[in-house]
C-alpha cells in the first residue's frame, strides 16, 4: 500500500485547485485539512478590507473618493470569492463558506475558530446545527474521522 502524506483523499490532493463553478465534495477530514488555509485567506481579506471600510465611512460626502473605495472593496471581496471557489468551497455570503459533503454542508463563518457547524442542502445558515450533534445523531459517511472537541 502506498504511503500517504495526509493531504490526499479520494485520489485527489486536498489542496487541488478547482475550476470556477466546479463543486467539490469533502469528507470531514478533508475539510479540516484545508480549513486553516480557508481561515487564513479569509482573515487576510478581512484585514485588507478594514482600512477600505474606514475610508468609505470617512468619505461619505466625497463621491469620487467613495466611488473609488467601493471599487476597491468589490475587488477585495471578489478576489476572496475566487480563491474560495478555487479551493472548492461554496461561498454563501460575505466571509461565510460551506464545504459540500454530498448530503449537506459543513458551515463556517469568519471569525469562528473551528469548522463546527452543519446544515442540509435545502437549509441555510439559520438552520445550521453543531457538527458534533449531527455526527452523534446521524453518523454520516463523510464523518470519516474522530470528531475534534
Where in the sequence are the language-model features?
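Long, hydrophobic N-terminal alpha-helical segment
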Residues: 1-60
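Long, non-globular targeting/processing and low-complexity regions
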Residues: 2-16, 75, 88, 108-111, ...
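N-terminal intrinsically disordered, cationic/polar leader segments
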Residues: 17-18, 23, 35, 49, ...
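Glycine-rich, aromatic-bearing surface loops/beta-hairpins
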Residues: 93-149
